[in-house]
């Protein structure tokens, strides 16, 4: 007598991301196939203020949340009852912005009788790489965003160990501050990147390596050096060499990031180097990493720009890992603006 194998049902996760100034909802299948990824950006709103205003960001999330959820389900062609779970960014991020997403996700989980998966924002950025490639372990991730600059080692799936982090400004924050000093509007990073690659020569600026062997980063001194060059030019009645400063700044940042990332890969025996975060869209950084990894014969994974900036598809990818190893999150979970990546790691016992 033949026994028919039960058909394996796909894991469909509706994910919500509201940690800063993008309202995003996605439907992700089995942690790697994006069925929809709707993003409502607030850049134009915050540009007038020269940066993200937390209260304004929260209000904008509330205004568009329902519409973005409806669009994500419609584009995916998925009915709520087909979903396996609802995932949401629990932290880190702006507390008011996080709360909007968490409340929405809890409401949907209750209304649809689905499990809830609280997800770490940086784990999402890291697992954005799984949307484009199969991950091999151990691996090393260079996280570069507006709020974070870290080197994260993963010896096993979903188990994170931070071996290096910024001691002051995150790299994205440094880009925005330097861009402002050079007269560019918010967000300034893309302007600096474009000008740096067009400049004929670079203004000499320092590289901050910190102690020998350290994987930590520091960008406040470099930022101060840029401001000093700009102010000295103005005091002499001269126009600052904006293009040269942009190139000098970017070369300094990129050299330190690339060198420490490559060293981290070698010292940990990592099989891949992953790049993630909003600054991963920076053309100068991508080109330098690609060139260096080709020379060093290191497998490099970089997501396309749409998965580098904040988006819900990456949250769905990370939530899938959590779901496979740990299951859901209690409905009384709270938004946590200081959420620890290492604490969010899946239990090692679940992998063995």
Question: What name fits each language-model region?
Answer:
Residues 2-11, 119-140, 318:
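Conserved phosphate-binding catalytic cores of ATP/NTP-utilizing and phosphoryl-transfer enzymes
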Residues 8-92, 125, 245:
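N-terminal beta-alpha supersecondary unit
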Residues 23-28, 141, 149-153:
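Short beta-strand scaffold segments in enzyme catalytic cores
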Residues 82-128, 133:
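Glycine-rich phosphate-binding loop and adjoining helix at the ATP-binding site
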Residues 118-119, 273, 290-314:
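Conserved phosphate-binding/catalytic loops in two-lobed NTP-binding clefts
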Residues 123, 156-198, 223-224, 228-232:
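Glycine-rich phosphate-binding loop plus the immediately following alpha-helix
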Residues 194-273, 282-296, 323-326, 343-352:
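A contiguous, well-structured pocket-lining segment that forms one wall/lid of small-molecule binding clefts
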Residues 303-341:
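Glycine-rich phosphate-binding/hydrolytic loop that grips phosphoryl groups
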């Amino acid at each position: 007598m033949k026994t028919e194998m039960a058909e394996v049902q796909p894991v469909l996760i509706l994910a919500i991301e509201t940690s800063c100034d993008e309202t995003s909802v996605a439907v992700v299948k089995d942690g790697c196939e994006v069925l929809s990824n709707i993003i409502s950006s607030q850049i134009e709103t915050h540009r007038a203020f020269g940066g993200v205003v937390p209260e304004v960001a929260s209000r904008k999330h509330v205004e568009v949340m329902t519409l973005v959820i409806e669009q994500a389900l419609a584009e995916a062609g998925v009915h709520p009852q087909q979903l396996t779970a609802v995932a949401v960014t629990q932290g880190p991020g702006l507390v008011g912005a996080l709360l909007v997403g968490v409340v929405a996700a809890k409401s949907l989980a209750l209304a649809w009788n689905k499990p809830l998966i609280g997800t770490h924002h940086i784990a999402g950025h890291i697992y954005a790489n799984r949307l484009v490639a199969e991950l091999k372990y151990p691996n090393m991730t260079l996280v570069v965003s507006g709020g974070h600059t870290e080197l994260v080692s993963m010896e096993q799936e979903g188990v994170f160990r931070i071996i290096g982090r910024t001691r002051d400004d995150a790299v994205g924050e440094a880009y925005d501050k330097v861009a402002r000093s050079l007269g560019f509007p918010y967000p300034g990073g893309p302007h600096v990147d474009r000008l740096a690659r067009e400049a004929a020569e670079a203004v000499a600026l320092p590289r901050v390596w910190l102690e020998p062997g350290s994987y930590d980063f520091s960008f406040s001194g470099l930022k101060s050096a840029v401001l000093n060059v700009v102010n000295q030019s103005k005091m002499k009645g001269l126009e600052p060499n904006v293009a040269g400063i942009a190139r000098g700044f970017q070369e300094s940042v990129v050299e330190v990031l690339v060198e420490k990332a490559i060293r981290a890969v070698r010292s940990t025996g990592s099989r891949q180097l992953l790049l993630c975060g909003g600054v991963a869209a920076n053309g100068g950084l991508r080109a330098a990493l690609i060139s260096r990894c080709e020379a060093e014969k290191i497998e490099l994974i970089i997501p396309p720009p749409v998965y580098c900036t904040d988006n819900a598809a990456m949250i769905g990818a990370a939530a899938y890992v959590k779901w496979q190893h740990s299951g859901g999150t209690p409905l009384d979970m709270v938004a946590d603006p200081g959420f620890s990546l290492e604490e969010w790691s899946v239990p090692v016992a679940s992998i063995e």
